Every structure is written in C-alpha cells, then in structure tokens.
C-alpha cells in the first residue's frame, strides 16, 4: 500500500455569542479543537487567521492544537457579543492512494466547541482558571470535490442556554508524497493491553517508492547504460499520477465554481479575476506529458512537479477565497438560511399528518391511537430512521439521531375534508395479506384511503403512491390481473378492520372511505345500507361519472358499473346526520352522485366539465353542512339548478341514466350504451364546457345504481352534438354550499360557471401515483377565493377537482374511483394545495416505467438545478408512477407530452395512440422536444431540466389571471385506458420566464385546436392526467386533483416516461382502446362485485379505485402551473399558493424520491398560505413570504451511497402503505427564518402578542423555559412577550378556583404594570396548568380579553381528568398524594369532588364557554404518558368510557361540551398531536413520567415540533 500525504484546511469562524438564558454573570470563553480518528496517521496545526474587532476582555490565543476565542463578559439578558475569531486548522494525514476520496468522505472530522466560565479573577495565561461548563461536538462531513461551506448555530445545554454562530469553510489543498513523519499508534495486544498508549513516528518514504510502489527497485538495462522500469511499476506510476492529479483538479474546480457562485450572488462581494481552467483538458495534457518520459528518475520528478504545481494553484485559490469571504456578513446570512432550511426539512421526516372531517373530532377513534403505535414500530423496523442522512455539519445532541428523534402524528380536523381518507393503519399483517393483489390497485386503494388532503402536498409515504413501487412497474403489463388482486386486498383490509372491532361498535361505524371505524359520540349513527343498495349506488355512480366525467376527454368507451367506485346506498346517505356528513362523506357522496355527478370529469372540469359534478362532494360546504341525502342532491341537481346555496351536496346536474339491476350480477346493473356527442370547441379564453360535457342520453336519477356501458365511438364523438352548454351547466350546478366567497366566472357558450370558493369544504385529496395527494387541486380546497367557480345556475361552487378526478384517474380506476374519489376527495383544501405543489416538483424528477416492454428501461430520476447541475442522479430508479395498475392506465402508450415555452399560446395536444391497459400514460415533457423527440426527451437530462424549470416557476407572477385551457380530447375511456386527443389551450397573462420559453416547441393553441379533430397530429402532450388540462386546473387550485390519490396514471407518475411505440392515429387508438376498455371493464366488473360485497358489509374502501382522469378546462394562473399540474398530477399544488397567485416552488414528492425538481440555487418566491388566503392551520392571513432557496431534497449534498440508502428506505416506508402524509413532502413548513436573523422592530403599532405559560402540578415558572426559548428563536423580529406564571408555583395542590384567581390576577397585573398594548393573547399550559387556563377564560374579569385570544397550546393537559387512567401505579400515587397533601386539585381531577358527576368541577368547566374563542386549539398528548391519559390530553373518547355504564355518559357529554363550540366556530382550528418519543429504558419511562415531561425538557422534540408545524400557531 502506497501512502500519500494529504492536507485539508478548515476555516472556523466564531461569529457571535448569544446569551439566550444564562443563569450567571461572569467571563466566558469558547475553545475549539479538531480531532480525527487515531487510526489515521495525522497532525493538526492550529492558528488564528488574523485578529479582528475588539479584544473584549482578553484576545484570542493558540495553545498547540487548541484555539481559545476572545474572553468576554456577560452581564445582561439577551446580550449579543461579536467575536469574529477566525481559526485555521490544517489537518495533515497519510492516506492510501487507492482510496483517497473514499477515505476523506467517510472520515469523521470532529470539531469540539467547549464553553468555559468563571465568575472570579481571570488571567489569560492560566487556562485552568476557566472551568468547562458545556461542550458540543460537531461532525464535519467533508467532500474532497465540493469541500465544505456551512453555517451553524451551536446551542449549549439546558443549564447554559447560549448560542455561538459558527461558519466553516474547508477544502482539500494538497496531495503529494509524504514530507514529514507522522506518529502512528502502536497496536496493542492482550499482553500489553494495559500499557499506556504509545506512538512511533512513521518513516518518510522515498519519492520512487511512492511513485512506483513500495516494492520498486531499480533495474539496469541490458546495456548497463540506463535504468528500466517494469510494466507493473510503470502502470502504478501512471495510475498514481492520474489519481492524484484528478483529485486535485476536481477539488480546484469545486472551490472555483463555489467561489464564482458566491461572488455572483453577493453583489458586495469582491470580484476577482479568477483563472478559468479546463479540468479535463489539463488532466489529459499532464498525463500525455508523463507518458513521454522513459527515464525513471525523470518520470518521478515530473510527476512530483506536476503535483506541486497543482497544489500551489489550489493553495493560491484557497488563499484568495479566504481573503474574500472571511467574516463576510452577507455570505453568513446566505449560509445560515441554507442550513436552517435543511435542518427543518430533516426534522420534517417522520412527522406525519392526517386530515379528517371536522365532525370526526368527536368520534371515537381508538383505532387511530393504536395505529400510531403500530406505525412507529413498523417504521423503526425499517431502515428509514437509521439511514436518515446527517446534515453537512452534524451535532447529534441538537439535530437528533436514531435514538433521540421523536415520531409525531398530527390530526387535523378541517371543513374542507368531507371524507376521512386517513384510515387507521392496521399493521403490516394486513398489508401482507393484500400483497397478493397487484401493487397497482393496492396503491390506488391506499392512496384513496389515505387521501392526502393536506394543505401541503401529501405524499403518502407509506402507502401511498404507486410510483414508489418499483414492482408496480413490472406489474403494469399485468394490469387486469392486478385489479382483481387489489380489490381482494381492500377486502382483506376491511375484513380485518371488521374483525378488530366489536360487533356493537361496527354498527356505529360510519362507512368511510378511510376505512377507519369512527363512532360519532352523540351523533346519529348511520345505518349500514344493504349491500345491494350500496352496490347499486356504486354502479350507478360510475355511470354518471363516466358519462359526464368523460365528457371532454372521453371519446368513448365501454364501462361496467363495477368499474365505478362503489358508493354507499342513497338510503345510507339520507340517513346521515348533517353533522356526520363529512365523516361519512364517502357514502353520501356516492349516493348523491349520480352517474354524472360522480363523474370526476364533470366535477373536476367543473367549469370544464359541467358534467362531472360530484353531487355528494361538491355539495359539501366549508361550513359543517353535511352532505345531504344523495338522492336529494340528485333530484336537486335537475330540479334546482339554481340552488347555488343549496347546502346539500352540490350535484353537478348531470343527467342520470337509470340502470336496471343485472340478472347475472346482483352487484351490477344492466349495461347501457351511451353515446357522447362531440364537444363544441370554445374560444381559447373560454373553458370548453362542451368538451367537458358529453351528451348523454337519458339519465334517470332514481337513485338506483346501474352500470352503464358507455361506448364512445370516434365518429360518434366527432359527429355527435354535445349537450348545450346550458344543459351541461345545469348538470354541473349541483347545490353547492354558499360558503364559497370568490368565484371565477368561466364563460362557456355565453354561460358563466362559477367555481366553488375555497371556502367550500369539499377538498378532495387523492393519492397520486407519485404518492402525493392530489387533493390540493380541488376548488374547494383552494384557498384563493378567486379560483372558485360558480356554476352558472347558481349551483353552488363545484370542486372542479372532483369533477376531474375520474378522468384524471386511470381509466379503469377512474370509473370506480370516480365515485369513490368523490367520496374520498373531500379533504382539506390546504393539504390538497400543498400536495399539488409537491407533485409539481416531483413531476420532472419522477420517472415512470411503463409496464410495456417498450418502456421497460427505467428512467433515471434527476432533478436539475437551475444551474443545470443535477442534484441527484441516483441511477435508474424504477418508480412505477402509474400504479401500474392496468386499470388506471388511461394508458396512452404512445402518448408523449410536449410543453411549449409560452403559456399563452402553448397548446397541449393530448393524443393517445394505442392505449393499452397495460401501458400507463407516459408523458415526456420538454420545452424543446417535439413529439418525435418525445422518447428521448424522457430520459434526456436537458428535457428534465427544462421540465423542472417550467414546472418550478409556476409563473412567478402567479397572477390570478386564469388561463383557459381548452382540452378537446376526443377519447377518454373511463374504467379502462383513456385516450385523450386534443389540445389544451391556456390563456395566461402570466409571464413565464423559464418554464416555457420556447414557443416553437409547442404547437400553438390555435394550431392544436384545429388539429384536435385529427388526432394523428404529431405533437402529443400526452398528459397523463387525462389530461393536462385538468391537472392544470388542479394546479391553480381550481380543481382538486383526483388523480393524485387514486389514479395511477397521474401525470406526475407517468411523466418522464416515453413509449417506444410510435404514436398512432386517434382513430386506430380510439378503436383499439374501446376494445381494450371493454375487456378491462369485464375484469373490473368482477372486481367491482367483490368490492361491492365489502360495501354491503359497510366497509368499503374507495381507495381501491382510482378516479378517471379527465381533461379539464380551467384558468391557470401560470403556464408553469399547468405543466406542473400535469407532471404532478399525483401531487397537488397547494390551493393556497395557487389561490394567492403565488409562485410556487416545485417540490419533490415522494414519488420523485425527494429530488428537488427546482434548481436548488434558484429561489422561488413563495408565499406561505394555506388553503385559502389564511394559514392552513391558524386560519390567519399568511403574511410570511420568503425565498424558498433550498431544495426539498435536503439530503442532496450527502454522499451518494447515503442518499441511495435513504431513498431505498423511503421506498420501504411506502410499501407499508401508511396513511396520511409526511411533512417532508410539504413545500412550506412553519419555520423559514433562521435563528437570530431579524432585528426586532420596536415601532410596531400592532401591539404585543402576550404568551402566558402556565406550569403543572408541583411545577415552577421555569418549567416552560425551553418552550419559550424555541418560540422566541423561531419567530425572530416578532413582538412577543412571555408571562411565565409563577403565582401558583408554591401551591399547586390547592383547588382550581383559588389557582384560577391567582393566575387571573397575575395576567391583569402584568399587563397593567408594563402598560402593554396587547394585540393577541395565547396560552401554553402543561399538565394541570391547562385546566387553570380554561378556568380563567370563564371569569368575568377576563371577558375583555376574549376577543384577543389566539392560540391555546395544551401540553399533556388532563382536560377530561384522570378518570380512565390505565396506569394503576400512577393512580395509586395520585391517590396517596391527594390524601397526603389534602389536594383539592387532585380530587377534582378524579371527578370525585361531588356526589353528582354533573356537579363536579370538570363537568361544570366543560359547560362553560372558552376554547372556541381561540383561533387555534392545539392538543398535544402521548401514548407513552401515563400521568395524563392520552384521550384526556386530546379530548377524545376512550374505549373504557364507552363500556362504562355509569360515568361513560358523563365523559361523552364533557367531550361534546368542550368540542361542539370549537367545531361550530368557523374561526377556530382544532389540531391534535400524538408524540412517540425515543425514550431510554428507565424507571421514569416505565411509569410514564418521562413522556409527560418530555414536552418540556426534550430540546429535539420541541425544536422539531415548533420548526416543522407549531410555530405557525403563534405567528
């Protein structure tokens, strides 16, 4: 082994020291040292670059390899001390020349920062005068090619709360023969194992032995006049020279490029004339010179000289770099922002969010709690936690690791969510059972079940999207088979669920898409409808959706009612209480949905396809109004087109076809042939409603489920006349909730269609194939009221998303899903929006493999940075974005997508060539590629890059100006592959710089428009959403993306996949597809029958079906959005973003493996808004805007092996099919501003936000110290004042009334003494303190402040007492304490302070108004906490209370008393958290105390909790 000497130089800048909350005044000093593993022979040299600034108490100094900072004195609270000490550490080491780069990348460079202190006399010469009080060790992850350039804030421990900001730059500066001797540790044996450590210096080798190898010996030539070199030694020399020169040149290139980037991005940075070097040419030149030398001595000298020259160049560049960037404030700010974003992103992993209908908050959800523990166990059994990549500068005490990072579950209860798609996860065993079924269908099932409806893009990590399954791609070819298997899966899951529940409870279960059993406490229970009814509904619904949903995109197809999503029987829906509407949404929607209503196309196209109205879902309004009987909606649809406000589920007004029950199959109806008329083409500016509205022959809304076989013939489509726009509009006008505030007027044939405002509650969330929820795209979800469309007839706002989803979904799934989707669609609008955002990013990076053998080759997912750098090229990763579900394959085998550069004129032609069920839609998006180039463009990086760019910048001026996208898609097959041919025209005023700069690439809309009739035209936009148009709409937030959850053909899934087959004319494709569709329909029918049996049992999972993807005409804010929409069909853009017309950064969805689709270095302006213009959670207007410069793929700078391992782990996680979504897929998190980055503005006129922190039993005012610290750090610049209550700390065993009086006096006195102008008041309570806070709210003296209440953060608060605590040990201890202390508070907690339970303190407190005055009610509990029962902390029903015949009713009444006002208040947002801490095996953990206090003293939990989600509650 030949060893070479390497030198890595580190520049460590200590910028500022912040006194966060130090207890003692005195002198402080920071000492830094560098360490590397002793197994590597090394020497460390330390020096100070130059003394700068004031010397403070004493100047900085160097002691051997230890550097001491300036010694400074701390006297005041929140004091900041400028250090500006620049320390240089030169690490010289011996490395194996064969493994130089690998060794450097894997080496642990450890930077130790020690805080020393003294409060006495101090002399700079005496190092021992200062005592060590706290220490942090930073692990520096160095790359020989990129170096290291990072900034971190290092916080010392809880007892010495202070922060030092550190900037680190590092580079490889030298590689050459060993010039000095290095001490080598002597290996110890068992004989001398106790001997003191010994070192011996290494021998300095000769130059020849280094260059030619250790065994080299000189050999004379035969003539004796010269020396000769054996070939082996000569090859060693060449390899040695090449390796070292290449490493040095790459290090030079990396440092040079970073230097250039810094000088360009920071205007004030000194500009230097840096020498450009062609690395490859220089390397080739050096190698050629060496090969010309024959004399061994000359060869060794030349190699040594070349290395010396390169080292000198590198050292000179490093010196220039340090001279320019050292202590550069703007660079420090830039690096701080980057580190903060990466850190928050890392925290967002394993932070799950579930969205539920608002009414579900009162439901009994024991299964949810159990599933959280099962999910944690399953996650820890995977490699996900252990493979979590570290940050570039890592501190495990601050950033967490496998043994310290908690897993957090968030439950949101949103008006926009009408169906509980996030069913409890019943464990791996269920998954394994369903594994027998095809992944494709399973994925769709999961996605629909999980229904990512988060304001943020929901990428269902576990289960969500088909794209995660590499196996799915292989299965695409077996799509038909997969469908049946998947249906089996869902049945298995449902069956398992049923088994887990007791029969008595099952009766109470509301049939939900989510599969989870929910018992509504105090609400009327739904009766399970007969299986026949359910089946009928499903069958009927499919037909509607197909009919109308197809409209623009559906040319013709046969579909069987079975293909439609199952719907609960109309009876069932009618039985539902209005309050339960959301919970049940699924069934009601189904019922309400007539064949046309469920049509995702109709609803989705809402303006686009009036036909697609989803009666059930659309009707749902943001307010709590429930879906009324579907039958009523159906009827109302026809009869009351004008009923805008109708709170009943808006029915789109689609005609229904009456289908008689089939004699053959009890679950299906007779086949009916429906011919759709051609759609009329509207002006580009107008939304083509005609296209959206297919002409259906008679539809009867008798509520009977019927299967309709719709055969679309190419000629029929072209020739048939479409219904008048008015009729279609009438269909659309389902009764929509009045709530929508803003409306888009879409002119269709002179008629206006209003899209529902975001206020509408129906936001549909779906899993896109990529695993991202598509829900964000739903109109209802869109926060921007502007995006809302009103149906012309005064129908309520319709969710175009809902209308479109089916079309968007894979055809097979579409049919089924169309109904099911509607059911599942309702999810929070916010989440939907976010999902769409995420999906956008993922689109470019997501590569899909078509099931076709043609598309077998996998596309390498790459995200291109703006600088055209590929962030990650992990090699080919197969992501079957299409669920590979053959069903859902709206398969356009040869579909290709071409994006044109300009949104305004761009037309997207969707041509489906041969749509085989097997083949998922594949889309190639490139600005430059023509249809002929499509194939290559999929894999080509430039195309991906351009695509990414286009998608990323959804029009920086996300003007609300809508673009009308006209899709004249001639063929859409529901239930089977859909072929869409047509063009999408988008009118957008938005200027799209980057995304679509090439007009030539895309056909003009007019051209496409004219070409639409001839599908054979060459450019195919192949938007897999059936159609990009719909996707685009979703992007805008006008329409919910249905494809997301259930359609495996989501664009995002299919994008980047190209078919090798040539495109075929529409005629051929339509005919072929029709036949294929019929075949698939038959198979789907079988599946439907099975599914319907499940429906009969009351456990139907809509997730099994994907809604059909449809083309949607919508106004798009920007063309980028359109493109993003298509690409990220699965991921939905946050409606908020769209709504606000904000530019949205592309976000990678899980489907894209977290590859940032947006160039990492190009910041995208993003406004943090949720569904509506209000923050998704806080409902407060979002005012935070910032540059989202960091890529979602926070781990992109990690070594490639680590990235691959982590991505593989994420895929494993996806296979678990976990419900909900992870915050890591959300584009914007709660914290975007680095610590200490904003100066506080004293001149603010808004007043002070007073946050009152109240401790618990036997606590003190310092208990919530860390909570206060992380809120202050996370919200720099805000006018926040903390009152750390101390009035009760001397006696927390008193009764609550006396403690309430003390706290109230303390608050009022604090405000008066400091003359505070209070604009907001928030409360944070721990344990018992939460009840004191609630009691204060009921006092007359506090009445004046009720209108200022903002957020109530309850940390493990016993709101329902300790009545049903499962820990006998804790119960005994509390009983003893109550007797010993004669504690009134403990007696009141057990509800034994009065003989009449309704006269106890807790019951009477629950009857008093209070919580609903807050904008946010945040309840944090933990299943590991045995001091306070989990259900009491989260105010929810527990299993024990249900069985208790005596106190159980009281318990239920308390829950209703507390939550009913909260749920009825539109301004009050309810969120619950379950924290699973990584606790050590100690006595505290055993008795449950560790988890109870972890919410106070776990820095990692608090930082993760606030940075990712909770800070927004205090903004």
Swiss-Prot record:
What name appears for this protein in its UniProt entry?
A: Protein FAM135A
Species this protein is from: Homo sapiens
Record-stated family: Belongs to the FAM135 family.
Q: Which Pfam families match?
A: DUF3657 (PF12394), DUF676 (PF05057)
Please name the GO terms of the biological process aspect recorded for this protein, alphabetically: lipid metabolic process
Q: Where do Polar residues bias regions lie?
A: 569-580
What does the tissue specificity note say?
Ubiquitous.
Ranges for the region named Disordered are: 569-592, 1062-1093
Query: Sorted alphabetically, which InterPro entries does this protein's record hold?
Result: AB_hydrolase_fold, DUF3657, DUF676_lipase-like, Lipase-like
* Residue stretches of biased makeup (Acidic residues): 1082-1091
């Amino acid at each position: 082994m030949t060893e070479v000497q390497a030198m890595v130089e580190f520049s460590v800048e200590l910028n500022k020291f912040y006194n966060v909350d130090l207890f003692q005044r005195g002198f402080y000093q920071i000492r830094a040292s560098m360490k590397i593993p002793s197994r590597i022979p090394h020497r460390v040299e330390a020096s100070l670059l130059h003394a700068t600034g004031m010397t403070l108490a004493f100047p900085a100094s160097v002691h051997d390899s230890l550097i001491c900072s300036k010694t400074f004195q701390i006297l005041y609270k929140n004091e900041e001390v400028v250090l500006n000490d620049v320390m240089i550490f030169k690490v010289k080491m011996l490395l194996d020349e064969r493994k130089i780069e690998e060794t450097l990348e894997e080496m642990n460079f450890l930077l130790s920062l020690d805080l020393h202190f003294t409060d006495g006399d101090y002399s700079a010469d005496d190092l021992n005068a200062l005592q060590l009080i706290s220490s942090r060790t930073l692990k520096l992850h160095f790359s020989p090619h990129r170096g290291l350039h990072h900034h971190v804030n290092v916080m010392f421990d809880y007892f010495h709360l202070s922060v030092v900001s550190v900037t680190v730059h590092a580079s490889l500066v030298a590689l050459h023969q060993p010039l000095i001797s290095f001490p080598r540790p002597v290996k110890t044996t068992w004989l001398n194992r106790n001997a003191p450590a010994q070192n011996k210096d290494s021998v300095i080798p000769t130059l020849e032995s280094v260059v030619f190898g250790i065994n080299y010996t000189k050999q004379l030539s035969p003539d004796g006049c010269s020396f000769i070199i054996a070939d082996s030694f000569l090859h060693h020399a060449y390899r040695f020279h090449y390796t070292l020169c290449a490493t040095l040149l790459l290090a030079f290139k990396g440092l040079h490029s970073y230097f250039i980037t810094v000088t360009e991005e920071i205007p004030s940075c000194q500009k230097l004339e840096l020498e450009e070097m062609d690395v490859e040419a220089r390397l080739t030149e050096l190698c050629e010179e060496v090969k010309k030398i024959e004399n061994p001595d000359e060869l060794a000298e030349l190699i040594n000289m070349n290395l010396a020259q390169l080292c000198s160049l590198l050292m000179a560049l490093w010196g220039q770099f340090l001279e320019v960037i050292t202590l550069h404030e703007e660079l420090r700010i830039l690096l701080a922002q980057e580190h903060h974003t990466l850190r928050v992103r890392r925290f967002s992993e394993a932070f799950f969010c579930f969205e539920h209908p608002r009414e579900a908050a009162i439901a009994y959800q024991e299964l949810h709690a159990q599933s959280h523990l099962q999910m944690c166990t399953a996650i820890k059994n995977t490699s996900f936690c252990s493979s979590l990549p570290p940050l570039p500068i890592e501190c495990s005490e601050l950033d967490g690791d496998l043994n310290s990072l908690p897993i957090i579950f968030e439950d949101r209860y949103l008006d926009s969510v009408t169906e509980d798609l996030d069913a409890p996860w019943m464990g791996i065993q269920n998954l394994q059972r369903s594994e027998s079924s095809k992944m494709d269908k399973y994925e769709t099932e999961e996605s629909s079940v999980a229904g990512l409806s988060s304001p943020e893009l929901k990428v269902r990590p576990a289960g969500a999207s088909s794209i995660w399954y590499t196996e799915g791609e292989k299965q695409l070819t077996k799509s038909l088979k997969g469908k049946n298997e998947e249906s089996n899966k869902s049945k298995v899951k449902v069956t398992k669920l049923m088994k887990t529940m007791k029969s008595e409870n099952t009766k109470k279960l509301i049939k939900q898409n989510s599969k989870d059993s929910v018992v509504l406490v105090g609400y009327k229970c739904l009766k399970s409808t007969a299986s026949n009814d359910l089946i009928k509904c499903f069958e009927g619904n499919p037909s509607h959706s197909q009919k109308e949903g197809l409209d623009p995109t559906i040319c013709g197809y046969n579909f069987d009612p079975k293909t439609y999503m199952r719907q609960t029987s109309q009876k069932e829906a009618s039985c539902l209480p209005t309050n339960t509407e959301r919970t049940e949404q699924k069934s009601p929607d189904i019922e309400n949905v007539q064949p046309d209503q469920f049509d995702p196309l109709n609803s989705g196209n809402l303006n686009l396809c009036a036909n697609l109205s989803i009666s059930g879902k659309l009707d749902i309004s943001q307010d709590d109004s429930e879906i009324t009987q579907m039958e009523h909606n159906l009827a109302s649809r026809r009869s009351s087109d004008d009923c805008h406000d109708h709170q009943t589920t808006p029915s789109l007004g689609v005609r229904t076809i009456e289908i008689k029950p089939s004699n053959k199959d009890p679950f299906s109806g007779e086949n009916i042939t429906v011919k759709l008329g051609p759609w009329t083409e509207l002006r580009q500016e107008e939304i083509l409603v005609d296209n959206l509205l297919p002409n259906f022959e008679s539809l009867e809304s008798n509520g009977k489920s019927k299967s309709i076989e719709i055969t679309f013939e190419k000629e029929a489509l072209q020739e048939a006349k479409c219904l008048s726009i008015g009729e279609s509009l009438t269909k659309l006008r389902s009764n929509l909730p009045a709530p929508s505030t803003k409306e888009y007027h879409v002119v269709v044939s002179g008629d206006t269609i209003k899209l529902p405002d975001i206020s509408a509650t129906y936001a549909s969330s779906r899993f896109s194939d990529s695993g991202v929820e598509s829900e964000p795209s739903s109109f209802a979800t869109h926060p921007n009221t502007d995006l809302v469309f009103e149906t012309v007839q005064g129908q309520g706002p319709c969710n175009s998303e809902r209308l479109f989803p089916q079309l968007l979904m894979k055809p097979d799934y579409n049919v089924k899903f169309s109904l099911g989707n509607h059911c599942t669609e309702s999810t929070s609008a916010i989440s939907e929006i976010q999902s769409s955002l995420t999906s956008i990013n993922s689109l470019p990076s997501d590569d899909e493999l078509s099931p076709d053998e043609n598309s077998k080759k996998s596309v390498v997912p790459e995200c291109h940075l703006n600088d055209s750098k590929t962030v990650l090229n992990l090699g080919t990763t197969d992501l079957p974005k299409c669920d590979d579900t053959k069903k859902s394959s709206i398969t356009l085998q040869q579909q290709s997508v071409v994006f044109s550069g300009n949104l305004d004129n761009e037309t997207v032609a969707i041509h489906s060539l041969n749509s085989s069920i097997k083949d998922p839609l594949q889309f190639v998006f490139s600005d430059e590629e023509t249809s002929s180039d499509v194939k290559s463009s999929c894999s080509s990086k430039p195309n991906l890059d351009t695509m990414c760019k286009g998608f990323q910048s959804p029009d920086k001026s996300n003007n609300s100006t809508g673009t009308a996208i006209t899709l004249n898609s001639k063929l859409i097959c529901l239930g089977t592959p859909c072929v869409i041919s047509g063009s999408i025209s988008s009118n957008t005023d938005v200027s799209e710089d980057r995304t679509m700069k090439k007009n030539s690439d895309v056909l003009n809309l007019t051209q496409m428009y004219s070409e639409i009739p001839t599908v054979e035209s060459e450019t195919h936009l192949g938007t897999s959403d059936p159609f990009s148009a719909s996707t685009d709409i979703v992007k805008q937030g006008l329409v919910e993306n249905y494809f997301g959850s259930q359609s495996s053909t989501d664009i995002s899934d299919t994008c980047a996949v190209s078919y090798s087959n040539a495109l075929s004319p529409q005629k051929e494709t339509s005919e072929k597809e029709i036949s294929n569709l019929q075949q698939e329909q038959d198979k789907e029918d079988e599946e439907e029958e099975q599914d319907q049996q499940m429906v009969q049992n009351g456990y139907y999972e809509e997730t099994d079906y994907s809604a059909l993807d449809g083309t949607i005409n919508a106004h798009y804010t920007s063309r980028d959005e359109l493109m993003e929409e298509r690409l990220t069909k699965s991921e939905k853009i946050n409606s908020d973003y769209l709504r606000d017309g904000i530019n949205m950064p592309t976000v990678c969805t899980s489907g894209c493996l977290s590859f940032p689709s947006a160039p990492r270095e190009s910041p995208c302006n993003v406004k943090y808004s949720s569904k509506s213009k209000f923050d998704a959670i806080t409902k407060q207007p979002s005012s935070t805007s910032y540059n989202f410069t960091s890529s979602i793929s926070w781990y992109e700078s990690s070594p490639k092996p680590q990235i691959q391992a982590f991505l593989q782990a994420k895929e494993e996680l996806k296979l678990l099919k976990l419900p909900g979504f992870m915050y890591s897929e959300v584009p914007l998190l709660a914290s975007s501003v680095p610590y200490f980055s904003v100066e506080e503005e004293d001149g603010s006129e808004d007043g002070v936000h007073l946050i009152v922190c109240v401790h618990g039993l036997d606590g003190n005012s310092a208990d919530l110290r860390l909570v206060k610290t992380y809120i202050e750090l996370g919200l720099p610049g805000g006018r926040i004042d903390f009152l750390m209550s101390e009035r009760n700390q001397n006696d927390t065993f008193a009764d609550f009334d006396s403690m309430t009086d003390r706290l109230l006096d303390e608050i009022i006195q604090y405000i008066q003494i400091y003359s505070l102008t209070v604009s907001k008041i928030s409360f944070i309570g721990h344990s018992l303190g939460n009840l004191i806070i609630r009691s204060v709210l009921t006092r007359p003296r506090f009445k004046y402040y009720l209108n200022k209440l903002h957020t109530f953060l309850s940390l493990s608060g016993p709101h329902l007492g300790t009545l049903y605590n499962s820990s006998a040990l804790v119960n005994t201890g509390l009983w003893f304490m109550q007797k010993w202390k004669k504690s009134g508070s403990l007696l009141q907690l057990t509800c034994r302070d009065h003989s009449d339970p309704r006269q106890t303190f807790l019951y009477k407190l629950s009857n008093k108004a209070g919580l609903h005055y807050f904008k946010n009610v945040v309840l944090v509990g933990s299943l590991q906490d045995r001091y306070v029962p989990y259900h009491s902390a989260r105010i929810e029903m527990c299993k024990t209370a249900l069985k208790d015949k005596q106190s159980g009713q009281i318990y239920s009444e308390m829950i209703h008393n507390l939550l009913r006002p909260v749920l009825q208040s539109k301004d009050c947002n309810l969120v619950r958290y379950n924290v699973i801490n990584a606790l050590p095996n100690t006595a505290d953990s055993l008795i449950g105390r560790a988890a109870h206090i972890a919410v106070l003293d776990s820095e990692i939990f608090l930082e993760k909790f606030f940075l990712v989600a909770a800070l927004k509650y205090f903004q």
